[in-house]
Each structure stands twice: as C-alpha cells, then as structure tokens.
Regions:
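Gram-negative bacterial Sec-dependent N-terminal signal peptides
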Residues: 1-22
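Flexible loop/hinge segments at secondary-structure junctions
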Residues: 23-341
Length: 341
C-alpha cells in the first residue's frame, strides 16, 4: 500500500485544520510534518476503528514549522491539539507557545527516519558526499581567493566519480523540518570543507552556506514528497530529497544514493553510520488533554508497541521503531505530564 494513498479520509490540508476546529471539537486536530503525515494518518484511521467512541482525528500537513506555528497560536477550540514534527521544537517556537498561553508542550518521540537522496530508477546510482551536494546547490563557490558564481552544470564536473548528468536538485522548502536537517547535516557539512569559507566571519559563513543558486538547478518544494516524486517524473535526471519511509514505499520508481559510501537502512540509521538521520516527534498541547475527547488515548495508542513498535503497521510503512526502553520512557514522561522546558 502506498503511503500517499493511506487514510485519505482523515487527511486534510494544513489550512483546513484551523478553520474546521470550531465545528469539530469532538475531533482531535493535527497538523505539521509531511514526513510524519503518513504515519499519523495510519494511526488516525486505526484509532477510529479501535476506539469507536471517538472520532478519527483529522490530520493535516503544512510542514513542521507550519504545524508548530499553528500549535503555538494559543489554547482553545480554535487551535490544534497536536503538531507533527520531523525535528525538535525550537526555543523561539517554545517562547511563542508560552506567550500565547501554551505552557504544557509535551514532546512525544515516535521513532526514527533517514533523509535520502534518490533519482529516477532508470538512472545511474549516485555516491554522494556533503561537499558534492553543497557544490551542486551553492549560489557562489570559492575560487582564487574570492567567491564566484557557481560554475557547475553537471554532476561529473564536481567529481568525476559522479554521473554525467545535468544538475537538478529537488529539495524541501523552508517550511519543512526535513529542510533543516538537510541543511545542517549535508549542506553545512559540505560548506565547511572549504577552507576559504571557514576563514570568513560568522555572518559571511552563514550567507555562503545557506544561499542557493537561482538558475533553475535547485527546486524547492513546499508540498509533500509526492510533489517531489512528480518532479522527478518530469525531470528524469533530477535528484530528490525524501524521507526513508517514502523511498521504501516507492523503490520501484527510485534509485537511492549512498552518502559517504553508506546506504540508508534501519541498521545504518540506528548505528549512526548513515549521516543524515533524525528522530521524529509530535507535540501534544497539555492544556487540551482534559477537554478534547480521545487526545490522551490517541497519544498512548500511537506510542504503543503494537502500533509503532517492531513488526507494527508503522514499521512496515517505513518508520524505524524505538527500543522498548525508549518507548517506556516516552510513555512515562507523557503520563507524568512532563512538558518541554
């Protein structure tokens, strides 16, 4: 079963979540990460079947940043109950939450995921390193003591070991948590391999590492991974950025790249040898636990071993499950009402 076809009845756009909240406060409202979206959609559908006394939650997307922004809008019927996120909540977001009266932000880790680079299945495999990715997308690169416009148009110009294909990188836009992990673990890591950039002051370094070319070779996707996949269909030479779970469900269409000679897998992500991985989360609004029907039950159901552990439906859909010890700690913190400080 394809992730993008699962539980469509409970998936809505991020914009719709806030507008329908007043009309359906016997229904849990969720928005956020495109990476977490398919997993949350599966759980929402199964939750509705398992607990007929509660309505199936309404799951929206909008990206991690978009979901957390909605989450931190305040407390009450017109605000969402859960924000899905492919990264930890930032201090600035937590401050925004508290300013709006959301003081009980409870973090729920659900498992792990890798960020993968994949091309059309009919194309040659890529063996990428962070410096390759940075050299492909940077607006400017150091040359003879100064920064010049990126001269590279084909991958093999960067490194002869790479395919002789035109450079087109399809990456998540800034509203996605995936973008932040991609920036930190691939782009920044690649940028830092240039001695000339490391010698710059911090502001100049940041600009050099985060300013991408605007000549059509870098395409930013604000939507979910299905949109990235569609771009690869129309641009067969493109390399796209996906979550490992999405790639697992589309192996017939995609060829995954190695990073630092390591292929992404459950084993390489858990042992840390694959460098572009992250934990996945959702955040629960503690102030809503008593007023929103089923919110407590949904949270405990999601992190149960049956739902998201080894051999579960979520693992089969691509989620890398936590250890029993981690799961027990997450559940204990939730039951104790432990909020993010």
């Amino acid at each position: 079963m394809r992730l993008n076809h699962i539980a469509l009845a409970v998936v809505v756009s991020g914009a719709a979540v806030a507008t329908t909240a007043n009309a359906a406060r016997d229904t849990i409202q969720i928005a956020g990460s495109s990476t977490v979206l398919p997993y949350a959609s599966i759980v929402a559908e199964e939750f509705g079947k398992t607990f007929p006394q509660f309505k199936a939650p309404v799951v929206g997307s909008g990206g991690s940043s978009g979901g957390l922004k909605q989450f931190c809008n305040g407390v009450g019927d017109n605000t969402i109950d859960i924000a899905n996120s492919s990264r930890k909540i930032k201090a600035t977001e937590l401050a925004a939450c508290k300013k709006a009266g959301v003081n009980q932000v409870i973090e729920i880790k659900i498992g792990y995921d890798g960020i993968v680079f994949a091309s059309n299945a009919s194309k040659a495999a890529y063996k990428l390193r962070p410096q390759h990715v940075y050299a492909a997308l940077a607006a400017q690169l150091p040359s003879n003591g100064k920064m010049v416009a990126n001269p590279y148009t084909r991958w093999n110009q960067i490194d002869k070991s790479l395919p002789n294909e035109p450079i087109t990188l399809v990456i998540p836009a800034s509203n996605h948590g995936t973008r932040e992990v991609f920036q930190e673990k691939m782009v920044d890591a690649g940028c830092e391999t240039y001695a000339a950039i490391k010698a710059m002051n911090k502001d100049a370094q940041k600009k050099a590492c985060s300013t991408f070319r605007k000549d059509g070779k870098v395409i930013e996707i604000a939507g979910d991974y299905t949109e990235t996949l569609a771009r690869l269909k129309t641009s067969p030479s493109a390399v796209g950025v996906f979550g490992l779970g999405f790639y697992d469900q589309n192996r017939d269409k995609l060829r995954v790249a190695t990073v630092n000679n390591v292929a992404p897998s459950e084993k390489t992500i858990l042992n840390g040898s694959y460098p572009v991985s992250r934990p996945l989360f959702f955040y629960v609004k503690g102030e809503h636990l008593k007023s929103i029907k089923g919110l407590k039950e949904y949270t405990e159901y999601f992190i149960s071993k049956k739902v998201s552990g080894k051999g579960s439906k979520l693992e089969r859909a691509g989620l890398i499950s936590m250890s029993d010890k981690e799961r027990a700690a997450v559940l204990a913190n939730f039951k104790a009402g432990k909020a993010v400080k």
